[in-house]
C-alpha cells in the first residue's frame, strides 16, 4: 500500500549475514523467474500496488531497466497463483559500479488481493538465497521509503 501523506525519507537497510532458510509458500502459489511476455503483468502489478499510475510507463520502465541486461532476467522472481497469474515480484539485483559488486533486494511487491499470505517474505527469501549462493554476495541492500508500508 502506498500512502503519500507520510513524509518521504530514503531508507536504506543493509544485511551483512544471510542465514539458510526454508522458503514456505501458501498452497496454490509458486515462485518462478521471468519469462518473455511478463512485462504487462509486472506493469499491472506495479499499478495495483500504487508504485505506478500508467501501465505504459510501468512496462517501459521494466523493459528499459531490467530487460536491457539479459543476465538480469534470471534474477527477476515472480510469485504466481494457481492459475499462473503474477501476484508478486522481487528482483535480486546485482550492480557492479566500479567493481564494488553491490547487491540489492529490489522492487518487492505483492498484489493487494494476495497480501498477508507470506508471499513477500518468500520472494525476499528467494532473492537472499540466490545472493547467499554467490561469491562475495554481501552485503545486500534494500532501499525503501515510509510510503510503502
PLM feature segments, named:
Residues 1-27:
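Acyl-donor-binding surface of acyltransferase catalytic domains
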Residues 30-42:
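A short beta-loop-alpha structural element at the N-terminal edge
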Residues 40, 117, 149:
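Loop/helix-junction capping segments adjacent to catalytic residues or to phosphate/diphosphate-binding pockets
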Residues 43-46, 131:
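Hydrophobic alpha-helical core bundles mediating ligand binding, dimerization, or RNAP-core interactions
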Residues 47-110:
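A conserved beta-strand-loop-helix scaffold within acyl/acetyltransferase catalytic domains
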Residues 107-112, 116-131:
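Conserved acetyl-CoA-binding loop-helix of GNAT-fold acetyltransferases
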Residues 109, 146-148:
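Active-site-proximal loop/turn and secondary-structure-junction residues that shape catalytic pockets
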Residues 131-145:
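Conserved GNAT acetyl-CoA-binding A-motif
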Amino acid at each position: 500500500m502506498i500512502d503519500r501523506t507520510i513524509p518521504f525519507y530514503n531508507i536504506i537497510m543493509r544485511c551483512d549475514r544471510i542465514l539458510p532458510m526454508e522458503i514456505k509458500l501458501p498452497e496454490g502459489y509458486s515462485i518462478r523467474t521471468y519469462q518473455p511476455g511478463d512485462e504487462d503483468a509486472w506493469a499491472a502489478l506495479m499499478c495495483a500496488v500504487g508504485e505506478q499510475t500508467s501501465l505504459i510507463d510501468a512496462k517501459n520502465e521494466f523493459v528499459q531497466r531490467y530487460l536491457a541486461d539479459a543476465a538480469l532476467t534470471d534474477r527477476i522472481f515472480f510469485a504466481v497463483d494457481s492459475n499462473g497469474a503474477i501476484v508478486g515480484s522481487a528482483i535480486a539485483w546485482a550492480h557492479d559500479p566500479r567493481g564494488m559488486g553491490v547487491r540489492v533486494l529490489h522492487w518487492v511487491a505483492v498484489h493487494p488481493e494476495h497480501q498477508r499470505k507470506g508471499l513477500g517474505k518468500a520472494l525476499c527469501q528467494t532473492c537472499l538465497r540466490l545472493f547467499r549462493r554467490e561469491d562475495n554476495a554481501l552485503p545486500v541492500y534494500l532501499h525503501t521509503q515510509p510510503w510503502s508500508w
